[in-house]
């Protein structure tokens, strides 16, 4: 827990941004350079992972060079008191950065371009190379800070999001089964809940991608094992959500009639799944599963019961996912 205390007060990325700003301004002042442009570069260079910082840094540096170059050129042509110098510098910087696929550096490049115009005066060459140097200082300093200090660890966030996802998807399955038993085959409420669930699942995918990138720079066998375990857990959740979506998004005018035994089976299974979070375990419902399997076997998949057999099959697959997850 010692490495997590700061999360309750201030985020690691915020700390690293502050440190990158401090060291960048310090180096610039030691070299008698204006630090503001380097600081702008350093602030936006702090990314969720070291890999992202390096990858985007490769594009931000040439973008900054382009912005500085246009600032010098248009100031030379129109002077630093002309609105055209600012407008054309910003416009051409955006245009060229877009053409060269340097969009990640466009914002800093434009800010650098328009901010340096008032201070250029007639020292065109000096200002161009000084801005180039300060941008390089900002990129390198921020990259090193992001790589060395408080390397990003997303395990805690992953655990939280996975737990939240599981809580919501078990509850949503329970609610959907109740709707089906009541003959409510189209539901805006469960559709919205499913959309929220998919957003959480996408966030999990993003966090796993960040952590995977980070482990390529900070290799650790135990951390790889932990990430693999979380990845498998997320994969199973995705399968669950996929099958859950198939019992939520049903064709229009769907109508399914369950007999008494099937209704009891659905109630038992949905209650068991809904109780996983509270109980911390999965209570098997073998008799109920046998009932649903028997129902499917008695149906012809090409008769009027085709949708019913498909729906029961999806429920059986969801049960199988959980049965495998909680196998002893």
Curated annotation (Swiss-Prot):
Instruction: Describe the family membership recorded for this protein in Swiss-Prot or TrEMBL.
Output: Belongs to the UPF0421 family.
Please identify the protein, giving its name as recorded: UPF0421 protein SE_1574
Instruction: Indicate how the chain sits in the lipid bilayer.
Output: Multi-pass membrane protein
Report whether Acyltransferase shows up as a keyword of the record. no
InterPro entries attached here? ArAE_1
Pfam name, any one: ArAE_1
Arranged from A to Z, the UniProt key words for this protein are: Cell membrane, Membrane, Transmembrane, Transmembrane helix
Q: Does the keyword section mention Metal-binding? A: no
Query: What's any one GO cellular component for it?
Result: plasma membrane
Q: Which residues cross the membrane?
A: 26-46, 61-81, 109-129, 132-152
Name the coiled-coil region(s): none
Domain of life, per UniProt, equals Bacteria
**Any signal peptide, and if so, which residues?**
none
UniProt subcellular location: Cell membrane
């Amino acid at each position: 827990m010692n490495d997590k205390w700061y999360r309750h007060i201030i985020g690691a990325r915020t700390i690293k941004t502050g440190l990158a700003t401090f060291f960048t301004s310090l180096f610039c002042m030691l070299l008698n350079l204006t630090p503001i442009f380097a600081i702008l570069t350093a602030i936006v260079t702090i990314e969720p992972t070291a890999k992202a910082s390096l990858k985007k840094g490769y594009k931000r540096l040439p973008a900054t060079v382009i912005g500085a170059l246009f600032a010098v050129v248009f100031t030379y042509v129109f002077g630093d008191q002309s609105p055209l110098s600012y407008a054309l510098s910003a416009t051409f910087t955006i245009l060229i950065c877009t053409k060269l696929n340097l969009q990640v550096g466009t914002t800093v490049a434009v800010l650098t371009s328009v901010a340096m115009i008032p201070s250029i005066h007639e020292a065109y060459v000096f200002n161009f190379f000084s801005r180039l140097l300060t941008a390089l200082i900002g990129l390198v300093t921020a990259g090193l800070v992001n790589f060395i200090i408080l390397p990003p660890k997303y395990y805690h966030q992953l655990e939280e999001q996975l737990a939240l996802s599981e809580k919501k998807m078990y509850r949503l399955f329970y609610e959907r089964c109740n709707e089906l038993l009541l003959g409510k085959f189209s539901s805006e409420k469960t559709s919205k809940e499913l959309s929220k669930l998919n957003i959480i699942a996408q966030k999990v995918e993003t966090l796993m991608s960040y952590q995977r990138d980070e482990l390529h720079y900070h290799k650790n066998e135990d951390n790889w094992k932990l990430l693999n375990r979380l990845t498998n857990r997320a994969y199973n959740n995705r399968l669950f959500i996929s099958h859950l979506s198939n019992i939520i998004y049903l064709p229009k005018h769907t109508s399914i009639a369950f007999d008494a035994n099937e209704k009891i089976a659905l109630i038992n299974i949905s209650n068991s799944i809904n109780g996983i979070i509270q109980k911390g375990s999965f209570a098997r419902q073998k008799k109920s599963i046998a009932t649903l399997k028997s129902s499917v076997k008695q149906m012809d998949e090409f008769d009027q019961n085709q949708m019913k057999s498909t729906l029961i099959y999806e429920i059986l697959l969801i049960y199988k996912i959980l049965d495998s997850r909680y196998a002893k």
